[in-house]
Amino acid sequence: MGDKTDVVIVGGGVIGFAVAYELARRRVPVLLIDKDLPGRATSASAGGLWPVGEAVGLGCGVIYQATQAAARKQAGLDPLEVEESHDGILPAAFRDLLVASNALYPDLSSELLETCGVDIEFRLGGGLIFAVYDEAERKYVERVTAALPDSCRLEQLTPEETWRIEPMLTRELIGAALLAGEHQVNPMLTAEAFKRAAIVHGARFRHDTRVTGLRRQGDRILGVEIGDEFVAAGTVINAAGAWTGELAATAGLSVPVFPVRGQIVLSQALPRTLNACLSTSGCYIAQKLHGEVLIGSTTERVGFDVSVTPEGVSGLCKGAVRAVPLLQHVGIKRVWAGLRPGTEDELPILGPVPGIEGYINASGAFRTGIVAAPLIARLVAQSTVGEAYDMPIEPFLVERFGEHALATAGPS
């Protein structure tokens, strides 16, 4: 027998750290175990808080939408007729989660700074502008506008109106969509702030430590195994990101999370050039606090490969230069790739598994981990300690996938 605690969290990305913070604030003894594997999702994030944009496919989700339209065109089908099941408009329950989570950030940024001294660089942005290049994209924006409630303000802009907001945008566009209330943080500092604030409240961490499996007895998860060591826990929270499914499988559980590679390009610092975050069918573009321009992100099902490829980087750069031509003269500071935890319906997997005690999911946020982290952390903490949920968790439970809990028989 090794360590023992009330709650073990496996995985130290922004979700894991945020859950640790919420539990530690509730004075729950918590131990977070993290291997810091290459390619965790936080490293693939732009730090854009784009709740409505992501929920309707106008954030980096529009890249998926463009791919679908291109595939239809190649197949001889009308690219304007995008099937409902294949568009980027996600369920209203998820949009509501993202909007509510985003609304927590202004107070949360101050709270974290006061608690642990880390500034997450929360910045009220000029919104999210989606540049419209052709009629297919214009028609998609019209569908999005019709699908949104009045509380989610989307303004369709003429080219002239767009250039007044963003003078550096290409003259190739035929219009744009503006989503207000979309902001930015530094993703790495946000994760670090959650971690340090959790420590202030009493959470413990084990770094560079790989959990090799879950220990299950009958219908209960007893704790985690670290090689020959066993750490007992009343509850294990699986926040292992792209590795969530692999960890769950060690206890005979099926949690359908898979890795999705996202390649990122970061430019050298520029004087303030962009007033808003930009999204196009080729990339998204966000100028960070210190002037660097972040260009992302590919969406690739390539397993756990975190390689940066010429094709991926070239595609992102071409998309960025098309949108903002002056970027062709800017040097590249860094390129990298991260693995985001994807699910087939693009919704996170949260909460308990029916028939299994002592186990909770906290994964699958895919492109929205940063913006969703505050509220996901609250929901998972509430699930752990038996509090009432801030919002319904049912749309995010694993049982929506059908056969979920008993992929193989657990040990008796």
Describe every region a protein language model picked out.
Residues 5-31:
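N-terminal Rossmann-like FAD-binding beta1-loop-alpha1 element of flavoenzymes
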Residues 18-25, 47-54, 61-87, 117-122, ...:
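Active-site substrate-recognition segment that forms the wall
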Residues 24-45:
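Glycine-rich FAD pyrophosphate-binding loop
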Residues 48-161, 320-321:
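Dinucleotide-binding Rossmann-like beta1-alpha1 core, especially the glycine-rich loop
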Residues 90-91, 118-134, 140-201, 298-302, ...:
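Helix-loop-beta segment of a Rossmann-like dinucleotide-binding subdomain
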Residues 176-235, 243:
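Helical element adjacent to the flavin cofactor pocket in flavoenzyme catalytic cores
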Residues 324-412:
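C-terminal catalytic lobe of FAD-dependent flavoproteins
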